[in-house]
């Protein structure tokens, strides 16, 4: 299975990055995993700080940084069986077969536009860190 991972905060080298790249590392044991990020140094810092083995994760061009055209982003995401996306409050429009959205802020505090409601239909699962984040 071909899986893409995106964390817009990869350069923060914090707990969320540990969480996302631990997921990537686990998935890479049995699947082909690509991390959408342009700076290898950031990934190396995460690997060292959190003692993660990221050797099986492929670093690929960050198509979510705004410099890639909508068409190119869509065509690239279509090549993936699954995408795991750490949301910065946005919901991506992608054409992967499956989309998993990780949210780190309380869902009740996120305003969802009509456009986002349409994009949510493509999300297979939303996962959160805690009951607090879920807004319970």
Feature map (PLM): residue ranges:
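Active-site donor-binding segments of glycosyltransferases and PAPS-dependent sulfotransferases
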Residues: 33-90
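A short, Lys/Arg-enriched amphipathic alpha-helix followed by its capping loop at the start of a domain
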Residues: 23-31
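Active-site regions of enzymes building and remodeling cell-envelope glycoconjugates
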Residues: 49-62, 95-105, 123-124
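Short, solvent-exposed loop/turn segments at secondary-structure junctions
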Residues: 9-11, 39-43, 88-91, 105-108, ...
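A short, glycine/small-residue-rich beta-strand->loop->alpha-helix junction that serves as a flexible
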Residues: 6-21
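Extreme N-terminal starter segment of soluble prokaryotic enzymes
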Residues: 1-4
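Active-site proximal beta-strand in glycosyltransferases
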Residues: 82-89, 93-112, 127
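Membrane-proximal helix-turn-helix segments that form the acceptor-binding/catalytic region
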Residues: 74, 107-127, 132-136
